[in-house]
Structure formats: structure tokens, C-alpha cells
């Protein structure tokens, strides 16, 4: 079942370009989309606008984090493996892992035919905004083998804003 990117049951957070309502564009790290759904099928359709490095989409499904490689241009369809559970209900958070090395347009989502999106609980009134540099965006935060060493050469795979201090503070 196709779900439009602007479905009201999807909660977006972050600084997002919404000039085209049905195709939000994530520019800043930590921009995200979250929803609850039933079933065992989950796909996200995105269009990547690569500036440099390799680009990845972050996903947390039922509290398990993964990353998915994005093509440098054009549409990428990512199928997320959904494990079975007793309730058949799942929580997913897709997020922009990296900084300005790319922008990402959300084209829509898919779940299984006959399945449904489930209303999210109300959003908190609390807000946090952080101004900073690449460290604030989670740059190279997963490069744990290089702690205390000279910066390594990489293609962006060590960047993950989920582990940045602003997102950790917000949680």
C-alpha cells in the first residue's frame, strides 16, 4: 500500500524544505520521519542529491538501528526487513545520518496491502536547537578505531547524527 510522504500520520522533525508539500526535502542532519505501522513490509522511496562522499539513510525499526546506502542520484527504493513480533505493530524512524554532503527528497513509503498506519502519540512541547560544526552533526562519530589518532580518510560512512551530542541530549 502506497503512503504519500505528506500523510498526516507521519511525524517529521528537523529543518525540512516543504515547498513541495508532497515531497519534503531533508537538508540538515537529524531530519526525520517517524510512524507506527502494522505488517511485515516496509519500503521508503527517496531521491538523493549527492554533493560528496557516499550517502546513507538511517533507520531505527523497533529500536534496532541500520543504515542503507543511497545511490548518488535518481530514485532509490529501500526495502527494510521487518521482523515478526507478537503484536504485528512496528515503530520506524528514518533519519538523515549525514551533514551537508547530500540532500534527500522523500517520495513516499510502502507497507503491505491491507496493513495500516497507526496514530502516533502526541508530540512533546519541548524543543532544542543546537548551533555547531561537524561534530554537532555527528561527523565521524562511528570512527571508534581512530580515537586519539589523526583524522582518517573516509567516504562518510562513519558519520551518524543519531550518536551526536544534540540528538543524545534531546532523547
List the predicted regions and their residue ranges:
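Extended, H/D-rich, highly charged conserved domains that either
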Residues: 157-171
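N-terminal secretory targeting modules
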Residues: 1-132, 136-156
Amino acid at each position: 500500500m502506497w503512503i504519500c510522504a505528506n500523510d498526516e500520520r507521519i511525524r517529521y522533525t528537523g529543518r525540512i524544505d516543504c515547498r513541495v508539500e508532497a515531497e519534503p526535502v531533508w537538508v540538515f542532519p537529524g531530519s526525520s520521519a517517524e510512524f507506527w505501522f502494522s505488517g511485515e513490509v516496509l519500503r521508503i522511496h527517496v531521491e538523493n542529491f549527492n554533493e560528496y562522499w557516499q550517502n546513507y539513510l538511517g533507520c531505527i525499526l523497533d529500536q534496532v538501528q541500520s543504515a542503507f546506502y543511497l545511490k548518488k542520484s535518481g530514485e532509490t527504493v529501500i526495502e527494510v526487513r521487518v521482523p515478526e513480533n507478537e503484536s504485528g505493530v512496528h515503530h520506524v524512524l528514518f533519519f538523515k545520518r549525514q551533514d551537508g554532503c547530500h540532500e534527500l527528497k522523500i517520495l513516499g513509503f510502502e507497507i503491505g496491502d491491507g496493513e495500516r498506519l497507526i496514530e502516533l502519540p502526541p508530540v512533546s512541547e519541548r524543543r532544542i536547537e543546537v548551533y555547531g560544526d561537524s561534530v554537532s552533526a555527528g561527523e565521524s562519530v562511528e570512527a571508534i578505531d581512530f580515537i586519539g589518532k589523526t583524522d582518517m580518510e573516509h567516504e562518510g560512512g562513519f558519520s551518524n547524527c543519531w550518536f551526536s551530542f544534540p540528538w543524545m541530549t534531546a532523547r
